[in-house]
Amino acid sequence: MLKDLNITKSTIFYILAPSNKFTGGPTLLHQLGFSLKKNFNYTVRMFYYGVSIDNPIHQNYKKYNLPVAIKIEDNPNNILISGEISQHLNLCINLKNIQKIMWWLSVDFFYISQKKLLIKKNLARRFLNYLNKRIIKKISEKIYLKIERLFEIKDLSKMLDSFNFKCHLCQSYYAYEHLKKNKIKNVYMLSDYLDDSFFSNKKYLGLKRKNIILYNPKKGVEITKLIINKLSNYEFKKIENFTPEEIIHLMKTSKIYIDFGEHPGKDRIPREAAYLGACIITGKKGSASNNIDISIPSIYKFDDYRINFHRLESLIDSIFKNFSYHTKNFSGYRNKIRNE
């Protein structure tokens, strides 16, 4: 990766992130900034966009102590790190000189954000046509043709070429495989890591586990609802409105975490749950479809579209009764998470 870049003592790394937002993607971007600063002694600046510009740093990211840039110096000595969503790409397209890197934190959200952009474009076009003013129609046509060339993804490689990225980094093997399949050049793996709080949890030692199944209410909503209704004799608990410390406690005292979401990248919560000792059961969408991103035995993965509820119920019963046996089956996955 570094061979594709021109890095000097005066190089500034700019990292794009939404202002005052605490979710998986922004967490990874702040962790990257912290790693570049701490491990390589690079000059790093966070560039925030969005509505909370006056107070852009979420309180959970203040610990990284990363300086904020008000403006990006667009010169070939500097480097811009962008995520894959359209908000980031909109900022990238106007910067012509800076060295640009795209970090694929997901595959699915890239396409979802592009579709949303196209919907907005089409609505705007209809509105301008409705006005029926020739001069506006001429201007709008030029603008929309340019946008269409950039964002209609008939050829991913050609579309990305228009942004002039020096290289592409992939947080998951799922993303890496997708880019290689689409003949994208200069593609490299760059995983993230779990927060230190998940590795230093000695005060939770000795806690007894309960027959509880955890789930993320924002992931795989329809399938999860179906599972909860079909298997109503079990206790399900959603991970919602908890502090990070409370989540750790929950994962250390529950036996199972299920995730039948889209897995657009190498999701954080399944790794957290597995590392803290829970057994995880997933579907086979996105990054869960391969044995690299979620490297767990196949018996713990189910076809999202044809769930065998009898097998799922038998597996849950077995985990509850023989937890010490099942949790050992995740030791390889835990070691991998520890070494990320």
Listing of model-derived features with the role each one plays in the protein:
Residues 54-58, 73-74, 88-97, 113, ...:
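Short loop/helix-cap segments at secondary-structure boundaries that form the rim of catalytic
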Residues 75-77, 164, 252-253:
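Alpha-helix C-terminal capping/helix-to-coil transition sites in glycosyltransferase folds
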Residues 25-28, 145-247:
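Conserved catalytic-core segment of nucleotide-activated headgroup transferases in glycan assembly
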Residues 2, 53-131, 142-160:
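Extended catalytic core of nucleotide-activated donor transferases of GT-like folds
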Residues 49-52, 82-89, 107, 171-177, ...:
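Short, polar loop motifs at secondary-structure junctions
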Residues 70, 235-294:
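Donor nucleotide-activated moiety binding/catalytic core segment of transferases
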Residues 1-79, 83, 178, 281, ...:
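N-terminal pre-catalytic "stem/leader" segment of glycosyltransferase-like enzymes
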